[in-house]
Regions:
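Acidic/histidine-rich catalytic cores and adjacent linkers
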Residues: 112-125, 143, 165-390
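Inter-helix linker motif
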Residues: 126-158
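RNase H-like nuclease fold core
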Residues: 3-110, 116-132, 151-152, 166-169, ...
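Short, solvent-exposed secondary-structure capping/transition elements
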Residues: 30, 67-69, 151-158, 328-332, ...
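Helix N-cap / beta->alpha transition motif
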Residues: 13, 136-138, 191
Length: 390
């Protein structure tokens, strides 16, 4: 490619590109905010292997929140802190919050998933005599509501038992294309929609013997392996109501943010659900979500705006996992230094500007300070110690 472009240089090696990206990432960490700006922080943990987690804090200026109808722009966000560790108690998170606040000033808002260790330390974040306003991610709250309303019922537990048995019964058979999707135990109710969608799909084919997807599958076989779903038809109708309400609400919040008129707007959006008979699951879920948004809205000063979704933070984690690929199997690595670059469009001018202030030695120092005792570092030390004596 270089020859085709007429560039008289060797193609950079994989290691060289990694070093440059880490250097740019460390430089981006130094270019964030100052104490005069009103900033919203988002904080979350990402698990890797064993007990290892990284505390990631990203932020944006409140003035950069998008207008209603638009989603957050990753370019407006900045990575503020990347802190790996094994123990994340409230005092550990508080230490990192204070360290960041001393550097760039405390936030006006802190948005997190509601975990106590992320939420409670925010009481010590004081800006202009006011405590930071703590907001909970709507998606996590909706998942908690779904677990309480649906997941704890005996019918749902029986349904999940059948789903597990069905996976084993249909894989590697002519019914393999009807196999249920896998669900992570930890985030089951944040991703239940895929399982409910699967149920709807299978019910369709159970009721339509002429469907192309049933070609080569006998009536007896499909009923034997998947006919149990018919017994849950009424339950699935109620569960799907809950999921549809959640989907509508999340789509709305990701384009509206939190404002002083959000409750009224959400109530209008969910009007058809709120008018259902009182025993319907869809109405119950809609009422609870409206109550949650109302409680969040009441925390805002008059005329203010904030955000109630960490979906963009989860997207950033997803990008990083793609960057890591097989490296993630060995715990967190020096590639964490690249994470801030995933929020930025990399241009030649940006690289020149950032590289003026950060050298290769600064990257190595950041790695020593940030990743002193990771799983990978301990594993490498174990090998060095063993083979040094041979």
């Amino acid at each position: 490619m270089f020859e085709f472009l007429g560039v008289d240089q060797k193609v950079p090696s994989h290691d060289a590109i990694a070093q440059w990206t880490m250097r740019l990432g460390v430089a981006e960490l130094a270019e964030t905010f100052d104490s005069t700006q009103e900033v919203l922080w988002m904080a979350d943990h990402s698990s890797q292997i064993g007990k290892e987690k990284v505390l990631l804090i990203i932020g944006m200026r409140v003035d950069d929140l998008p207008p209603p109808g638009e989603t957050l722009d990753l370019e407006k966000l900045k990575v503020l802190a990347i802190v790996p560790g094994e123990k994340w108690k409230k005092e550990d998170v508080d230490r990192e919050y204070q360290r960041l606040a001393e550097k760039i000033g405390p936030p006006v808002y802190l948005l997190c998933d509601g975990a106590v260790e992320l939420r409670d330390p925010a009481k010590n974040l004081i800006k202009d005599g006011k405590q930071a306003i703590v907001l909970q991610n709507l998606k996590h709250h909706a998942a908690n509501l779904l677990e309480k309303q649906v997941g704890r019922s005996e019918r749902f537990k029986a349904f999940m038992t059948q789903v597990g048995l069905t996976r084993n019964r249909v894989q590697q058979t002519e019914l393999g294309h009807f196999m249920p999707p896998p669900l992570k135990q930890k985030s089951r109710f944040m991703n239940l929609g895929s399982l409910l969608r699967w149920s709807t799909m299978v019910m369709h084919h159970l009721n339509h013997p002429e469907s192309d997807s049933r070609e080569g599958v006998t009536e007896e076989r499909i009923e034997e392996k998947l006919g149990w779903l018919r017994d849950f038809a009424d339950d699935l109708a109620q569960w799907n109501q809950c999921q549809e309400v959640i989907n509508e609400t999340l789509s709305w919040i990701n384009q509206s943010g939190l404002r002083c008129d959000s409750t009224a707007e959400l109530r209008d959006l969910l009007a058809s659900w709120l008018e259902l008979p009182s025993g319907q699951s869809g109405r119950q879920m809609a009422e609870k979500l409206v109550d949650f948004v109302a409680a969040s809205e009441q925390q805002l000063p008059a005329g203010s705006r904030a955000w109630l979704s960490t979906e963009i933070l989860e997207s950033l984690f997803g990008r990083f996992k793609q960057l890591e690929r097989q490296h993630s199997k060995g715990g967190f690595t020096r590639l964490l230094a690249c994470l801030p670059t995933l929020c930025r469009r990399v241009t030649a001018d940006r690289v020149r500007s950032r590289f003026k202030h950060v050298q290769a030695g600064d990257v190595q120092q950041w790695i020593r300070d940030t990743l002193p005792n990771t799983l990978t570092a301990r594993r490498n030390a174990a090998y060095r110690e063993a083979f040094a004596q041979q």
